[in-house]
């Protein structure tokens, strides 16, 4: 498999770890059509520190919404089945019942957005989250450095999906970007 970077310049994908990303030359044409009203920007910036982004009566609702979008993640090198099971219980019940009751949200069925684990821990998360709608996310593709071949990355993604992951957090090869 070959990927063409520029005319007459190809890099075999199986050796992509050794490839160097030459980047692109800076081109200002993308900014030529942008007009900025400097005084309006300065006026807006001056008001930012004195304003709250969310009014007090809506803060709890926004915080609960944020909880529903969080991926609870455990990516410790010594993760165990027990760690994953505890994390999944927290994902199913992220806020104490008494606090939800004070907010009138006791029937909201609040959960986090997902639980993220290493590929080898997917079965434990799947077991703990059975019967819920909480998706499992897996870090695949050689986390954290991404220093495995493209073929191995694709294989690991396929295995993670087959094991039950609904979301895949991928790691790009940093040396291709930097």
Predicted regions and their residues:
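Alpha/beta catalytic barrel-like cores
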Residues: 2-104, 108, 113
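Alpha/beta enzyme core
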Residues: 57-67, 78-110, 120-178
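Short beta-strand scaffold positions
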Residues: 116-117
């Amino acid at each position: 498999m070959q990927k063409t970077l520029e005319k007459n310049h190809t890099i075999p994908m199986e050796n992509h770890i050794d490839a160097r990303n030459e980047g692109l030359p800076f081109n200002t044409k993308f900014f030529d059509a942008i007009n900025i009203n400097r005084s309006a920007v300065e006026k807006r910036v001056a008001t930012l520190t004195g304003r709250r982004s969310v009014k007090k009566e809506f803060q709890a609702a926004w915080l609960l919404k944020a909880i529903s979008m969080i991926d609870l993640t455990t990516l410790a090198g010594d993760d165990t089945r027990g760690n994953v099971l505890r994390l999944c219980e927290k994902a199913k019940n992220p806020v104490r019942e008494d606090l939800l009751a004070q907010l009138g949200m006791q029937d909201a069925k609040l959960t986090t957005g997902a639980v993220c684990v290493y590929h080898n821990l997917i079965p434990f998360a799947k077991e703990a989250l059975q019967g819920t709608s909480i998706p499992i996310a897996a870090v695949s593709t050689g986390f954290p450095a991404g220093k495995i071949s493209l073929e191995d990355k694709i294989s690991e993604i396929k295995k993670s999906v087959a094991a039950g992951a609904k979301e895949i957090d991928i790691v790009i090869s940093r040396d291709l970007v930097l």
